[in-house]
């Protein structure tokens, strides 16, 4: 029997021959219901009547088409001689009860029961009068598939592993899931094994704690929402969805660790973390919905005081060029210089501005250093494909606005000079006092940082700050995209249509 099934690949269940192989496997599993022990079941060849019976139960479709991890489920049972692991003497085991309870409460982990066969298991185990062999085998595999799926989702986030992932990555992901499943079955520790898969980030843990608090809320408003009686109660639905989406973002996080700078784009703030605590923070201004600040990682090795602003071409041709055509003094009044393709500074009067347009603009425009400069007095550069950086600004009143998605994409830092002083503390080359002295010279200078610091630009619409969870506007509409990807396009979740109305616009 094992040799017959050795070529089984669930991705090809639509193939009649392979489907028959899998049905034969089900018959083998129906030869007896044993506790997980490693005993090999009978190798008798099933009769045609047995195969026909299972095929009739299957009602013309593959019995396990709904499994997310069909190949792993098969591999697990193959490794364990096709012995059921969630049943004992035709009764769901205590392990099965624990797993079913976990699935019913999986919302507390930011996941949804519908993704883990909750409805099908409900029908099989609670709506059926008798637990026949079909119910035992199918429910056993559904529970196994649910465990593997939850294990993956907690460790890697709700994502689809695709052809873009390397074979080594896929093998590693699958091997980890199988090891955890085997350990769970042997040790009867479902919850602890699964919780080991979760991120250790403090932000994730605090969001999870807040979500659990809401879900366990005994208020009538909370119960009404969770029971589907209302779609949104005092923003409860939006908060639940935001918590779930951002917990999933932290599951996918891998770059943030140790000493680092985090910029939260929707939150409009910057935090510098050392030794697991925030030691510096500042308000920031980020890109508009049209000119979005990207999610990225970088490393700040130095910063520049009294920087030039090399105006991006899009701004030069779309904003500055029309002004220069209307006003011959515009460039001079705003301290702009015009550079030739060779980098030479040109006099504005030597240029025929009326002949220029976006397809004919061979010049570079830069703004001179000084208090008038749009970058302010300090610029923190780090390599990235978007030419985005952190900088000071001469428009400081904008920080008082609640909604601060106002820039062309770069991040304006309210306490930019304080950040510069902080980064040179203990610097072998330049001290904070030296920096203050250099600023008095009003000359451009590059300051090296002895200990370069990673910087992470992230999109988080809720976060734990100052002892409470804060919720932020979905300024770029990214939450809606994540929601559709996580829940909206999954046919299993269609019953939970109430949830979608909790998403912030």
Where are these regions (language model features)?
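N-terminal secretory signal peptides that target proteins for export/translocation
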Residues: 1-17
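Generic detection of long, well-ordered alpha-helical segments
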Residues: 17, 93, 133-144, 197, ...
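Sec-dependent signal peptide recognition
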Residues: 18-25
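Enrichment for repetitive, rod-forming helical segments
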Residues: 26-28, 419
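C-terminal motif of bacterial Sec signal peptides marking the signal peptidase cleavage site
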Residues: 30-32
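Well-ordered beta-sheet/strand-loop patches within structured domains
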Residues: 34-72, 76-79, 148, 164-172, ...
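Cationic-aromatic interfacial patches
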Residues: 34-171
């Amino acid at each position: 029997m094992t040799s017959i099934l050795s070529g089984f690949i669930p991705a090809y269940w639509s193939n009649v021959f392979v489907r028959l192989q899998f049905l034969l496997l089900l018959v083998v599993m129906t030869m007896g219901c044993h506790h997980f022990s490693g005993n090999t079941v009978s190798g008798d060849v099933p009769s045609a009547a047995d195969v026909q019976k299972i095929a009739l139960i299957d009602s013309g479709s593959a019995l396990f088409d709904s499994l997310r991890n069909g190949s792993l489920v098969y591999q697990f049972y193959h490794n364990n001689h096709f012995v059921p692991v969630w049943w004992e003497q035709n009764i769901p085991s205590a392990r099965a009860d624990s797993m079913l309870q976990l699935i019913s409460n999986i919302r507390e982990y930011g996941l949804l029961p519908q993704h883990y066969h909750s409805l099908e298991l409900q029908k099989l185990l609670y709506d059926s009068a008798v637990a026949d062999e079909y119910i035992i085998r199918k429910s056993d595999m559904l529970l196994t598939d649910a465990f593997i799926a939850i294990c993956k989702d907690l460790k890697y986030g709700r994502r689809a592993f695709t052809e873009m992932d390397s074979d080594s990555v896929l093998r590693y992901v699958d091997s980890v899931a199988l090891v955890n499943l085997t350990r769970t079955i042997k040790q009867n520790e479902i919850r602890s094994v699964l919780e080991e898969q979760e991120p250790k980030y403090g932000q994730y843990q605090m969001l999870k704690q807040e979500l659990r608090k809401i879900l366990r809320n005994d208020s009538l408003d909370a119960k009404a929402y969770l029971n589907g009686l209302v779609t949104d109660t005092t923003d409860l639905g939006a908060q639940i969805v935001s918590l779930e989406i951002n917990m999933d973002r932290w599951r996918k996080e891998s770059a943030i660790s140790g000493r680092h700078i985090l910029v939260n784009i929707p939150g409009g703030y910057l935090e510098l973390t050392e030794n697991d605590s925030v030691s510096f923070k500042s308000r920031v201004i980020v890109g508009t919905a049209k000119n979005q600040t990207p999610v990225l990682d970088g490393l700040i090795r130095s910063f520049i005081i009294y920087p030039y602003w090399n105006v991006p071409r899009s701004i030069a041709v779309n904003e500055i060029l029309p002004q220069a055509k209307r006003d011959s003094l515009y460039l001079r009044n705003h301290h702009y210089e015009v550079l030739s393709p060779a980098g030479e500074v040109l006099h504005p009067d030597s240029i025929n501005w009326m002949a220029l347009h976006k397809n004919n603009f061979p010049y570079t425009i830069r703004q001179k250093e000084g208090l008038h400069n749009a970058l302010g007095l300090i610029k923190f550069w780090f390599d990235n494909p978007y030419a985005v950086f952190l900088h000071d600004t001469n428009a400081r009143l904008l920080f008082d606005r609640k909604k601060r998605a106002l820039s062309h994409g770069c991040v304006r830092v309210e306490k930019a000079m304080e950040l510069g002083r902080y980064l040179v503390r203990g610097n072998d080359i330049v001290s904070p006092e030296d920096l203050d002295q250099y600023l008095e010279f009003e000359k451009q200078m590059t300051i090296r940082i002895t200990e370069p610091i990673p910087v992470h630009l992230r999109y988080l619409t809720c976060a734990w700050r100052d002892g409470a969870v804060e919720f932020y506007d979905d300024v770029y509409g990214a939450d809606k995209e994540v929601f559709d990807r996580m829940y909206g396009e999954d046919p299993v979740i269609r019953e939970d249509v109430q949830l979608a109305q909790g998403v912030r616009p």
